[in-house]
Amino acid sequence: MILFFELELKLPYTNSLKEKRNILKSMLEKIKRRYNVSVIESDAQDNINRSRLSFVLISLYQNNAVSQMQEILQFIEENYEVEVIDIIKEFL
C-alpha cells in the first residue's frame, strides 16, 4: 500500500525565508530519519509563512499507513510552532 499525502502548513512566527528553510530542513530530516518516509517541500517555497509538504510512505496495510501518517502529524504539531491548515491524502 502506497500512501501519498500533502500537508499545508502555516508558520506564523517565521520572519524570513532563511528562518523558514532552517525550520523545515530540521523538521524534514527528523521525519525522514524517524519514520522512513520520503518528504519534500513541494510548494510555497517563497512564502515566509506557508509551506506545502508532500509525503510518500509504503506499508503492507492501509491501517498501518494511516497510523504512521497520524504519528507524523502528531510529531509535527508537538515539536514545531506550525499549524496544519489542510491535509490531502491518496492511496495509490
Residue map of PLM features:
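Beta-strand elements of well-folded, non-transmembrane domains
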Residues: 9-13, 59
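C-terminal structural segments of small proteins and small subunits
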Residues: 57-92
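Active-site-flanking beta-strand signature of metal-NTP-handling nucleotidyl enzymes
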Residues: 3-9
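Short, charge-patterned binding micro-sites
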Residues: 40-61, 90
